Amino acid sequence: MAGRLRGPAVPGGGESSDSDEDGWDIGYTERPDKLKDSLLSEEKDEVLKRALTTGDGSLLEELLNSGMQVDSSFRFGWTPLMYAASIANVDLVRILLDRGANASFSKDQHTVLMAACSARVPEERILKTAELLLSRNASPNATCRKRMSPLMYAAREGHSQLVALLVGHGAEINAQDDNGYTALAWAARHGHKTTVLKLLELGADKTLQTQDGKTPAEIAKRNKHPELFSMLSLTLNPLHGKFQNITKEENICKFLITDSEKSRDHGFSSYSAFGDLEIFLHGLQLEHLTELLKERDITLRQLLTLRKDDFTKIGITNVRDQKKIMDAVEELQVEEIKFEELPEVMKLEFSGDEFLNFLLKLSKQCGHLTTAVQDIISQFPVHSHKIVLEWGSPECFTSVCEDLVHNAQNLGEEVGKLKHLIQKLHNDQKNDSCRIPPMENVSTGKKRLWKRAAVTVCGFGLLFIVCKLTFLRK
């Protein structure tokens, strides 16, 4: 029986008779040869947990045959179906559903389908479980207390085929939770490239913002996923709505059957992974160039540095394809500071706006440089066997890195000096008795004097009229 244990040890299992809590033991306990009708309710609960833990379908059926209610709940509210779904045991789920278990059951708005979508098991098992639950009318649009849907749980875990299955059964792809996160935002936050691509293919809106005003691209950047940031920042929405007009059956078939056939030779993953180059080309609807670029061993970084003449040399002759790539590269390029446009000498007429603009550009450039280094770090080969071409001596690279660190420190020191000078200038201006006040202050003082004079004149005029009327009456 020990050989029938499946998956990680999560809710379900044997409990000692001395336990006051409704806890779960993970160890193996011997199964009785035959269940007795006289078993107490507590004993049946213990045997039921054992059946769920070990994945023992025959023991579960014996319990149900002995009179145990299929939707009986444990002390903390979960039903057997909820436990079976949480470990994505499709055999147990099928037995319980066939016996009348409620596929739409929820505890504190957490549904059975949500439990399956967040299971810590291989995606293939989750797919089978979710498909079975959906066939028994489990709602793909139910939300938990935080308004998260099963689709958001699937996207958060990076299950791309599960995402396709849920959307194929009517899940709202652009629904938002309490924080304004969509399924796309959740996938971007956790760096799931394949899931992001799948959601974009299915029509996810990458312009929707969270409650704090962040788009999926900005979320990816904040969580240090530069490739996703680049892809989501493109003007075009990659393959937007490409599969929105096909039927539910065609949708499910398209994203489940074909992908599973491709991955038969790969034991653990049921979906194929996409590299940076593939994602970039998908984003521009240029998938047909993938094989061409791979044959010529052109990486994404090399592609981003090509010029118009280079495209023709490598076989990209279509003008529209060339323009798409160049427009995308132009959009992703770092804005360079044109130092030659700055005044050579600091003159008195050098405006504060120009100086502020220089500082803002300098700060932006430093931010871009930091992002570029983070990008290199995230893709740097950790193991030497992953390096295809022979590299030079590491001392050469470390020496340049030391120069970079030294230059960065010098930049920090110089900026600190500049800040000190600005503060000193500000203090000198405040303490200078001969300083001419700004025109705004002068004009404001004159306006006040004119207002006072006008009020005084009006007051004297009103007093004169009152006195004259009083004199005439007498």
Swiss-Prot record:
SMART domains: ANK, SAM. It is found in: Cytoplasm. The modification Phosphoserine is found at residues 16-17, 19. Its main location: cytoplasm. It comes from the Eukaryota. Residues 270-333 form the SAM domain. ANK repeats lie at residues 43-72, 76-105, 108-142, 146-175, 179-208, 212-241. Keywords: ANK repeat, Cytoplasm, Developmental protein, Differentiation, Meiosis, Phosphoprotein, Repeat, RNA-mediated gene silencing, Spermatogenesis. Residues 1-31 are annotated as: Disordered. GO terms for cellular component: pi-body. Interacts with DDX4, PIWIL1, RANBP9 and TDRD1. This is Ankyrin repeat, SAM and basic leucine zipper domain-containing protein 1.
